[in-house]
Amino acid sequence: MTSTVKTPLPAVDDLAPQWYVIDAADQRLGRLAAEIARILRGKNKAIYTPHMDTGDFVIVINAEKVTVTGKKRSQKLYRRHSGRPGGMKIETFDQLQARIPERIIEHAVKGMLPKNSLGRKLFTKLKVYAGPEHPHQAQKPQPLTINTIPGA
């Protein structure tokens, strides 16, 4: 017995991506990254299709003010390797936040996206800025408030 149920695919008109701006000031890193990944993936929409890019663009401002709980500020490590022998570099959350605060949110969100070509395409829709300014005013981004602090 064969099934005749077709997978509903969203129309091209429905795929018009929105632009959202999220303020990361005083937000928890992991909860914020999970919500950003959900929006990039398009899981907040009724037309979500796993193998298609149905997500929206996300602009994150004030990345330098993102917070973590517990001792992660001094104990969470970020590793990178140059590819050369002895080229491993290790930084703590504090050190990386002082040097490149955007990289922290990018690293967290990238780990929550698919590890394939679709995930790489979705990652290009994330724009992270350390301060409160961004160059995407022409896209008319809508402010999106995310509460990542439980009980607040």
Swiss-Prot record:
Keyword match RNA-binding: no
Keywords, in A-Z order: Ribonucleoprotein, Ribosomal protein
GO BP field: negative regulation of translation; translation
Biased composition (Polar residues): 139-152
Origin: domain of life: Bacteria
Record Pfam families: Ribosomal_L13 (PF00572)
Stretches for region Disordered: 133-152
CDD domains per the UniProt record, alphabetical: Ribosomal_L13
UniProt GO cellular component terms: cytosolic large ribosomal subunit
One function term, GO molecular function aspect: structural constituent of ribosome
Function of the molecule: This protein is one of the early assembly proteins of the 50S ribosomal subunit, although it is not seen to bind rRNA by itself. It is important during the early stages of 50S assembly.
Protein name in UniProt: Large ribosomal subunit protein uL13
Organism (species): Thermosynechococcus vestitus (strain NIES-2133 / IAM M-273 / BP-1)
